[in-house]
Amino acid sequence: MERKQAEYSNLDERYAIQGEKYQGQQYSHIYFTRLHHMRNLLHALVPSWKPHLPVTTVLGLEEGKDCIIVGTLYKHMKLKPSILDEYSKERSAIPLVKPHNFMHPDDHLILEDESGRVTLAGAIPPAAYVTGVVIALHGKETSAGNFLVEDILEAGIPPQITLPSINEDKYVVFVSGLSIGSEKFNPLQFQLLIDHITGHLGDENEQSIASNIVRVVVAGNSVHISPRFFNGQAVASKDQSRIAEPIKELDIMLTQLVASLPVDMMPGSNDPANFSLPQQPLHRCLFAGAATYNTFSSCSNPHQFELDSVRFIGTSGQNIDDLYKYSDAKDKLEFVERTLRWRHLAPTAPNSLGCYPYTDKDPFLVESCPHVYFVGNQDKYETQLLQGLEKQKVRLICIPRFCDSGVAVMLNLRNLECSTLSFSTSFDA
Amino acid sequence: MSSGGRGGKRRGAPPPGPSGAAAKRAHPGGTPQPPPPAATAAAPVAEEEDMMDEDVFLDETILAEDEEALLLLDRDEALASRLSRWRRPALPADLASGCSRNVAFQQLEIDYVIGESHKVLLPNSSGPAAILRIFGVTREGHSVCCQVHGFEPYFYISCPMGMGPDDISRFHQTLEGRMKDSNRNSNVPRFVKRIELVQKQTIMHYQPQQSQPFLKIVVALPTMVASCRGILERGITIEGLGSKSFLTYESNILFALRFMIDCNIVGGNWIEVPAGKYMKAARIMSYCQLELDCLYSDLVSHAAEGEHSKMAPFRILSFDIECAGRKGHFPEPTHDPVIQIANLVTLQGEGQPFVRNVMTLKSCSPIVGVDVMSFDTERDVLLAWRDFIREVDPDIIIGYNICKFDLPYLIERAEVLKIVEFPILGRIRNSRVRVRDTTFSSRQYGMRESKDVAVEGRVQFDLLQAMQRDYKLSSYSLNSVSAHFLGEQKEDVHHSIISDLQNGNSETRRRLAVYCLKDAYLPQRLLDKLMYIYNYVEMARVTGVPISFLLSRGQSIKVLSQLLRKAKQKNLVIPNIKGQASGQDTFEGATVLEARAGFYEKPIATLDFASLYPSIMMAYNLCYCTLVPPEDARKLNLPPESVNKTPSGETFVKPDVQKGILPEILEELLAARKRAKADLKEAKDPFERAVLDGRQLALKISANSVYGFTGATVGQLPCLEISSSVTSYGRQMIEHTKKLVEDKFTTLGGYEHNAEVIYGDTDSVMVQFGVSTVEDAMKLGREAADYISGTFIKPIKLEFEKIYFPYLLISKKRYAGLYWTNPEKFDKMDTKGIETVRRDNCLLVKNLVTECLHKILVDRDVPGAVQYVKNTISDLLMNRVDLSLLVITKGLTKTGEDYAVKAAHVELAERMRKRDAATAPTVGDRVPYVIIKAAKGAKAYERSEDPIYVLDNNIPIDPQYYLENQISKPLLRIFEPILKNASRELLHGSHTRAVSISTPSNSGIMKFAKKQLTCLGCKAVISGSNQTLCFHCKGREAELYCKTVGNVSELEMLFGRLWTQCQECQGSLHQDVLCTSRDCPIFYRRRKAQKDMAEARVQLQRWDF
């Protein structure tokens, strides 16, 4: 049997920060660029939304007069952790907040543009929005100086290139959260996955399916390195070599994979990569074995690529995890969908999500709608085929952590249908 | 305060300002005065409070009416209508036109002027008289100025034996003659109006007879009290009686206070003028909505109860100004223009300001919710502000450092610009405000130089002064004060940037305006948060002094005011005894039992005397009027059962013979406090609660200050017999308690353990009962308190309040422990005398001490604390400590030459000025510095360096300095009771052997060094420019890369958190952070993160080959 091929092009260029330097620049530029870009989009949409209303700036507001304003949201949050807390006088024995979510009923939204800020009230639920989102609002200024929102316009799902028609089944496998080196990692489980993908497992039918897998995407957190190695204290020399142990193990397993098919390796929050988004590709020197194959490609996070002209975009999950901390939704997919509607992969960057201080661009803006949008390292597998107003179709996928669930996700390029590959090493399961 | 000396100086000098009519605040009629009484002139600062009358305003300062009209010409119509929106509500028709209803208002300020006596109200008098003015606000928010007529200044002398009515009239004539001699240029027809014979008694010493004759001398004008007193004290020859000098009584009381006492008015209470008893002013003198004239006897003063305990809707103006300073100089009014004034006006009791505006020089882009008013000239800005004050008519003006900076600056600036019509900011028409320098000195608050700007009819409340009075903080910058109380960092724009922003465009000026507004809002928020209005009004009500006294004067006026009120009820008069400033009459202070230092791991019960000193005074009836001096004791021959002999050997009569006034005042204060606390429990309304809580606090402070009043040797009425008796009783009680506890709670007495008193302070005793649970210790503590209280005279009471467990006793007045009031859970960690907040300590010390105490007391983990100390010291020596933790900050109060001893921060400021004069700290700034490594033998002051400079140039800090001069003492203090050999263990262990010092990038030697790449793994020099690792380390590539990238990752996280925090404080996402607040704990970290980040990325890029 022969493995199918798909034409691959890597679109990560926009996430590279190779030439960028820290020269004292601040975060205001990235907000400015974002606002500028999004405002053009939103202004273009206003005539078809509420053509009769004037568009103004925060400054131009007049009390009681209906108008539309466009700006960046800022969410004032009481419980938001602050670095200044380290200096607070009293230390409390018990943490006051559940660590996973910083919402509070007193939270409120503020809209900001270059001219000023105004507090929002009315038909805009603070729970659904976060700092950094650019939107247009219809409403009027009240006598108290607040802006009473009546209606909200988001930029919406961006336009999409047409989905190419592919006549045969071709699969892409997504896996994330291997956490090699942690206690939860089960080497046998991962080996089963590798064997399945490489066609060493199962009957002929299964093997033929495996041969249709054209690519594997590893969406972050492949290793787990004990944080004690990085807290500044000296590390005993016998421990030093242990730092790299999980990476070597990963390399060995990856080498098996890349020997038979192309693999995209994305960094995640626990991987030996930089912290801020966009995370730069894991260094090739970490993969002494796998890197010798040209099927191995180390990618950035977020990661963007095309396979047979099907457009993919995905992250290792930090953007969605952060939304989960600072806002509320029925499930993770809703967060994913929101980032598309806001046309921004990581609106909370740089506010609560680390991010490089760009001066002239905001690489997380989503200008064209992908066909597949995946997010790694989530609690459970969720998927949905999202339909846009302009007939855009996007497959949204939350990839569960493999070390917890033993689940990898398989996507069919032909019809964007999704299924799971589930591996278990215990008999009762 | 000494007006005597000052007044004299000013009088000779021409009034400043171009106009001869510039406000001149002096004595009546502008007439040359006799030299002020010798006592006050000779000792200008010695008295805590000089009782000279100062609240006199001259007719002369008032401009002619046509002048006024001229000033108001060509004012901008548009501006006028803009400002008029904020006027006070209009008067109801019946008040506006007639006099048919009672007028009730809450008064805030009382002063007086000299004017012609009122023809209608006082048909029988003529000539100049003192007219009292009461400023206040009605319940509906209307401003009132009530002019009170007919109240005359007076004082007493004791009547010489055998003086009859004829003698009195002769005496009158003689005195009148002497007065005329010393007040030659005065146009007053009669100086001494009359002399009455009254029956009074002096407060000093026990007197068996109820009363004796006194002469009440009534003079024409308040200032004549002092000159008349001088004549009488120096001696006067009376026909038939010979030459005699007199002791005067109640001759040093401010006229306004005298009036308040006699009319039963207390500070901030409600006053009602009944319908028909007042008339509308014929000639309107003030900008108040309602101006009345009435007789002092017709005023109704309401006690602060029920409806009358509420607050009127005062208008509180909070403002801040910005000046464009020149580079390298602190703004000076002679050179630097005022460019912005931000104003917020809030109604008392409301959460949000109802006026928010900013006045700017040159255009300024609009700001949401703020009225931006831009002007082309500075003159227009200043005049607009004056008009604004007049329209809004604030009752209280607040701000941060307004008394020393903002207000004087505005006025002096207007003088420089020759805007004569600017300083009419008070409530009196055309009366100009002027700046005077004053010094204020008091035992409690220390000596303070300040400027005094009297704005008639408006109370000034400078939050900076209030903070300095009421709180001990390590820094009083607005930034650190708001961080402390509001939990917020304030953006701080360096004054060198302010000029750049001003010279930019309307956007940059808007940026500045936003900053200025924030600075104007913070004082208001502090005022609300700390309930200052409630607390100060209540304090004024309790002690009976005007609110303005509370900030501008010391403690003793408050006690004196109460004493005078009480004495008046009792028909007693208070002699004018000037305290001797000599320190000879000192007496033994409070006792402190020997502290048995140690770390106690059994519960320690604390027995406290509730209000010990007030209780002693009440229990033993200690007062001026119960004291029997030794010479009298023999004469009076009092039976021993009717007197108390105090341990210090004084004699006081018992209450059944004569009840003391001080005990009575104290009883009332404490009873009122009890009542207020009970009411507080009942009260639901938050405003009512605020008032009551303020009241109980004021009552407590007042009760405790009575003792201090009697002991203040330079005070108004010192009486060391009382204060030394109080402390001697206190000592006796502490010893007595110790003895009783140790005698009763013994194994012999049937208890499990022998109790041990381990320490005793002024009013508390710490007992170790030996039991091991908090609950048992509480039980025994209560038992002991009840048992011992039974042996004392009421109301002295020993209370059991709290348990310390565990308890670390370091030495006297220094301890730490967990504080328990219930057996389940401790309340807090309580420390005393352990420097966690001292100014000249760096943050590292504070963190270290706090963390150690936490580990020792809460976690009960002594080894953990030791390990923590070792790690921190090791970090310090290995140069891993965040630089901001090492910054020491000191204020630069004067220039280098003025300092006698060389100080680190002064030297540094000098050096920085040589580097760059524009950003170097100037006088008034705080100078942050770190101690760096320098040549051997260099003095500490030579080794100070700017933290920014240190960061930029990789200069090594001196860890030994920090180890020896900063952290060792506080640490050893804590650990010595716990560890043997603490010093050796903590400061000289193996953890101190590894040292790492960074190489400075600007030192001389580096200019000769050649840079070579080294292997990132082992620091071996590698040849070839594009390699990262040496041959040997090649195999560890993955591991070493992980470490490098891990480092970058940490820095990125820090970088993001720090810079987004600054965006948050700044309140804007789209604008660059400008803040350079060196008080902010993250300022240096932010800077360092930026620099480290750039370096770490360079390292990371070395892997990209």
UniProtKB/Swiss-Prot annotation, chain A:
Superkingdom field: Eukaryota
Pfam families: DNA_pol_D_N (PF18018), DNA_pol_E_B (PF04042)
Cellular component GO terms held in the UniProt record: delta DNA polymerase complex
Keyword Nucleotidyltransferase in record: yes
Membrane spanning stretches: none
GO biological process: DNA strand elongation involved in DNA replication
Matches recorded under Gene3D superfamilies: 2.40.50.430, 3.60.21.50
Protein keywords: DNA replication, DNA-directed DNA polymerase, Nucleotidyltransferase, Nucleus, Transferase
Main localisation: nucleus
Entry similarity comment: Belongs to the DNA polymerase delta/II small subunit family.
Subunit comment: Heterodimer with subunits of 125 kDa and 50 kDa.
Protein name: DNA polymerase delta small subunit
The species this protein was found in: Oryza sativa subsp. japonica
Gene expressing this chain: POLD2
UniProtKB/Swiss-Prot annotation, chain B:
EC number(s) stated in the UniProt entry for this protein: 2.7.7.7
Compartment list: Nucleus
Keywords on record: 4Fe-4S, DNA replication, DNA-binding, DNA-directed DNA polymerase, Exonuclease, Hydrolase, Iron, Iron-sulfur, Metal-binding, Nuclease, Nucleotidyltransferase, Nucleus, Transferase, Zinc, Zinc-finger
Broad class of the protein's primary localization: nucleus
Residues holding [4Fe-4S] cluster: C1062, C1065, C1075, C1080
Annotated region (Disordered), positions in chain: 1-46
Residues annotated as binding Zn(2+): C1015, C1018, C1030, C1033
GO molecular function: 3'-5'-DNA exonuclease activity; 4 iron, 4 sulfur cluster binding; DNA binding; DNA-directed DNA polymerase activity; nucleotide binding; zinc ion binding
GO cellular component: delta DNA polymerase complex
Catalytic activity as recorded in UniProt: DNA(n) + a 2'-deoxyribonucleoside 5'-triphosphate = DNA(n+1) + diphosphate
Pfam family, one: DNA_pol_B_exo1
Zinc finger (CysA-type): 1015-1033
Subunit note: Heterodimer with subunits of 125 kDa and 50 kDa. The 125 kDa subunit contains the polymerase active site and most likely the active site for the 3'-5' exonuclease activity.
Annotated family: Belongs to the DNA polymerase type-B family.
Miscellaneous comment text of the record: In eukaryotes there are five DNA polymerases: alpha, beta, gamma, delta, and epsilon which are responsible for different reactions of DNA synthesis.
Description of its domains: The CysB motif binds 1 4Fe-4S cluster and is required for the formation of polymerase complexes.
Function of the molecule: This polymerase possesses two enzymatic activities: DNA synthesis (polymerase) and an exonucleolytic activity that degrades single-stranded DNA in the 3'- to 5'-direction.
This protein's name: DNA polymerase delta catalytic subunit
Protein source organism: Oryza sativa subsp. japonica (Rice)
Gene: POLD1
